[in-house]
């Protein structure tokens, strides 16, 4: 009886082990991903996916002011603040940036969220290790962002003003690069 019980226990446990599933869509390029309720199609550009995503409507409104289509070039890595990130800015900030007089600042802000080349989270982590805990990236605006890994193993970006943003979604493959979702808007130093 004990042997039968032991046998059934082993069979049951091994069935549980083999029955577990993981979401492999995050690691396989070419799969459509749901990013916080927004569908990201890897056959579309970063710009196309952001403009079609309700979770990025604030970023979309800013991007519509960009006649150069910064996020449609190839290859790029974009750190995209979602609507929650923009809601953390002081009231009126986005409306002020959308004024015609602030168009250069607006474009600078967009460029500050993009880096040339396809940079995976593994690449970022390797650069952080090689940099003794910090990695510096030059954005399309010519300004820098610093990356580190915090105590919770999250990649944290620090802007030129000391503001920090956690990367909440990693390695969202797009036709022209990689998109990351971030929790705060990164702000470059604005020079008058």
Please provide the spans of the model-predicted regions.
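Bacterial Sec-dependent N-terminal signal peptides
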Residues: 1-24
């Amino acid at each position: 009886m004990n042997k039968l019980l032991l046998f059934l226990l082993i069979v049951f446990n091994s069935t549980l082990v083999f029955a577990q599933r993981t979401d492999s869509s995050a690691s396989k390029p070419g799969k459509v991903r749901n990013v916080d309720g927004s569908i990201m199609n890897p056959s579309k550009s970063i710009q196309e996916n952001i403009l079609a995503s309700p979770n990025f409507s604030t970023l979309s409104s800013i991007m519509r002011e960009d006649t150069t289509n910064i996020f449609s070039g190839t290859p790029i890595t974009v750190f995209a603040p979602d609507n929650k990130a923009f809601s953390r800015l002081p009231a009126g900030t986005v409306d002020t940036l959308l004024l015609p007089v602030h168009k250069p600042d607006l474009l600078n802000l967009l460029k500050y969220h993009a880096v040339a080349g396809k940079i995976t989270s593994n690449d970022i982590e390797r650069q952080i290790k090689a940099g003794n805990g910090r990695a510096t990236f030059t954005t399309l605006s010519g300004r820098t962002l610093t990356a580190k890994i915090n105590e919770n193993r999250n990649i944290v970006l620090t802007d030129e003003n000391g503001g920090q943003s956690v990367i909440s979604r990693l390695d969202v493959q797009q036709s022209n690069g990689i998109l990351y979702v971030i929790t705060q808007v990164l702000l470059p130093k604005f020079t008058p």
